[in-house]
Amino acid sequence: MSFSFHEKTFFDKYGVRVSLLEDEDFIRAASMLAEEVFGFGIYKESKGSGGRFYERCWLMGSEDVLYGRVHFGGQNNTILFELTGTGCGVAKEGWESRLFAFLTNAIRPKITRVDIAKDFF
């Protein structure tokens, strides 16, 4: 699953609790959001370019498993979250409702990709 929203959303969500002056400030806010919604946050910046036409990329999960990516920089001041199937599977219960509540109040929210699979055994 992938979704994006405008970076100004963090000003409304966190207000003065979070300094939002540098890219790293926005990434800290993105990690806080991921922790609140999914139960895991960002653990390191990815090497190389950001991908998806963004300037930079950060990884969610751990050294052993990738739960998703957060892309930031460029793209009309938006931030893009990409969750892997593993990330969706390990997210804390109720993440769908928490994400819906967040996106409902976000600035310029957009669900950019949803993958659905059905296993037949």
What are these regions (language model features)?
Residues 1-121:
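Structured, helix-rich domain cores that form ligand/interaction pockets
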